[in-house]
Amino acid sequence: MLFRSSLEAAVFQLLKEKGLTLGCAESCTGGLIAKRMTDLSGVSAVFRGGVVSYATEVKHTVLGVEQALLDEFGAVSEPVARAMAEGARRVLGCDLAVASTGVAGPDPDERGNPVGLVYLALAAPDGTWVRKIQQGLGRERVRHVSASHAFDLTRRYLSGLEVK
């Protein structure tokens, strides 16, 4: 059972208070954002679902990320994170959508992006914001820290704080 003070619990409470829904598109977090949301009882009132778009072609075919964007910038990039969040918002029919794309490790990706480089995006009716993080080594640590950053990004938006 999660503590009520967890980031995901705070996001859940804020979504309920504001009557908004959330979805997610995950790559490097591999479904961890969705898992942490669905660990909370009653979350079906606000959580629409998620897409684990681990493969690049899924980012294109399911989320609608333009192939030209993937070719130019690669899957681990700010423009792709932005497009993933916007695609998830559209596909899942939710008010807000958060996305993660990055390099969990143990090796750099094919473009040479280092382990621990992650882009998180939040798409909302009034805009899309991206946060770039670079964190310590360890696949599990990268996944868990990235999911927490995704919840923090969402919490900040819902709380009316600066989203960065």
Which residue stretches match the model-derived regions?
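Short alpha-helical segments enriched in small residues
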Residues: F3-K164
